UniProtKB/Swiss-Prot annotation:
Belongs to the class-V pyridoxal-phosphate-dependent aminotransferase family. Csd subfamily. It catalyses: (sulfur carrier)-H + L-cysteine = (sulfur carrier)-SH + L-alanine; L-selenocysteine + AH2 = hydrogenselenide + L-alanine + A + H(+). This is Cysteine desulfurase. Cysteine desulfurases mobilize the sulfur from L-cysteine to yield L-alanine, an essential step in sulfur metabolism for biosynthesis of a variety of sulfur-containing biomolecules. Component of the suf operon, which is activated and required under specific conditions such as oxidative stress and iron limitation. Acts as a potent selenocysteine lyase in vitro, that mobilizes selenium from L-selenocysteine. Selenocysteine lyase activity is however unsure in vivo. Homodimer. Interacts with SufE and the SufBCD complex composed of SufB, SufC and SufD. The interaction with SufE is required to mediate the direct transfer of the sulfur atom from the S-sulfanylcysteine. It comes from Salmonella agona (strain SL483). One of its GO terms (biological process) is cysteine metabolic process. The gene is sufS.
Length: 406
């Protein structure tokens, strides 16, 4: 069955607009995906007809809002096949989720002389929190190097583990290269050394189904805004036994059981003790609508369509004169490239003149840029609403830029 891309595009109002007098070709979904009417309408309806502060409210609106929020927690747990909804913490996004783990689990479990393993392709959100933790604790940060094609040098991984390795923190899919890492093998190796595993799933959950139980990771985190949902909301999954042992890292309302000026404070049970303050309930409602939306289309069908489009894009872009493509042949979601010796910002500016939106810069992956010896790259990302015609426009635009700039 053909993927209904035109029907999908009709659900995204922003795709009907023009930029610089030309139809928008939005090739920047890896930075943040556009939102369908179903998400926009769900969040709007909540604020128009159902808004109230959640937790402890005895009135109807509060009770309904609380129920709606907790239903999304259950929905998200099914989406990633968690064992229980109580293994999921609502966070602002992937960055906050990783910082929560570093500041809660990491503070309790990392000691001087321990080590944490990451890779050279990580987003800053999966580098900087571990650097900060290691500096604070006197621990070591070890790095899995890359092959030239943008895949991990897995033959070096076993040597990085030892009896002081406490955590492997690894991206599921690179936000720059599109590399999908072989998590089952990596997690199995971590288990041999008694290490925990955190997976940054920000660039994975929109492209194919994720099963955290099958992966057997300890932590999995992703953002709503890359999954066609609102900004400011994400999910942190933690295995239940581990989550119940973790202390809170932020204090305030909603995360406590009792507060006394003389007896101190006791915490709510997990996951609620990690959700201090008033939550982004509207964002949570929107996230639920986004999960409904991609589930209704079928992640397998979305993935098949995107892979077909990716193959076409790589074939066509390879014909552009003087282009350098980064990353493996088999990839998800993104194509990073440079055009001759021209700075990525210049190329991106020209493309914007043609109504084509790509991302330019270091993509929050400065160590990866340093490894490739470039200050920046252009990145085109492909989502379920992109088309062959938009790929053709990108190729034509780059060919024209090469002709103009030489």
């Amino acid at each position: 069955m053909t993927f209904p891309v035109e029907k999908v595009r009709a659900d995204f109002p922003i795709l009907q607009r023009e930029v610089n007098g030309l139809p928008l070709a939005y090739l920047d979904s890896a930075a943040s995906a556009q939102k369908p009417n179903q998400v926009i309408d769900a969040e709007s309806a909540f604020y128009r007809h159902g808004y109230a502060a959640v937790h402890r409210g005895i009135h109807t609106l509060s009770a309904q809002a609380t129920e709606s929020m907790e239903n999304v927690r259950k929905q998200a747990s099914r989406f990633i096949n968690a064992r229980s909804a109580e293994e999921l913490v609502f966070v602002r996004g992937t960055t906050e989720g990783i910082n929560l783990v570093a500041n809660s689990w990491g503070t309790e479990n990392i000691r001087a002389g321990d080590n944490i393993i990451i890779s050279e392709m990580e987003h800053h959100a999966n580098i900087v929190p571990w650097q900060m933790l290691c500096e604070r604790k006197g621990a070591e940060l070890r790095v899995i190097p890359l092959h030239p094609d943008g895949t991990l040098r897995l033959e070096t991984l076993a040597a990085l583990f030892d009896d002081r390795t406490r955590l492997l923190a690894i991206t599921h899919v690179s936000n720059v290269l599109g590399t999908e890492n072989p998590l089952p093998d990596m997690i199995a190796l971590a288990r041999q050394h008694g290490a925990k595993v955190l997976v940054d799933g920000a660039q994975a959950v929109m492209h194919h189904a994720v099963d955290v139980q099958a992966l057997d990771c300890d932590f999995y985190v992703f953002s709503g805004h890359k999954l066609y949902g609102p900004t400011g909301i994400g999910i942190l999954y933690v295995k239940e036994a581990l989550l119940q042992e973790m202390p809170p890292w932020e204090g305030g309302g909603s995360m406590i059981s009792t507060v006394s000026l003389t007896q101190g404070t006791t915490w709510a049970k997990a996951p609620w003790r990690f959700e201090a303050g008033t939550p982004n309930t509207g964002g949570i409602i929107g996230l639920g609508a986004a999960i409904d939306y991609v589930t209704s289309l079928g992640l397998d069908k979305i993935g098949d369509y995107e892979q077909m489009l990716m193959r076409y894009a790589l074939e066509q872009l390879a014909q552009v004169p003087d282009i350098t493509l980064y990353g493996p042949a088999q990839r998800l979601g993104v194509i990073a490239f440079n055009l001759g010796n021209h700075h990525a910002y210049d190329v991106g500016s020209f493309l914007d003149n043609y109504g084509i939106a790509v991302r330019t810069g270091h993509h929050c992956a400065m160590p990866l840029m340093a490894w490739y010896g470039v200050p920046a790259m252009c990145r085109a990302s492909l989502a379920m609403y992109n088309t062959h015609e938009e790929v053709d426009r990108l190729v034509a635009g780059l060919t024209r830029i090469h002709r103009l700039l030489g």
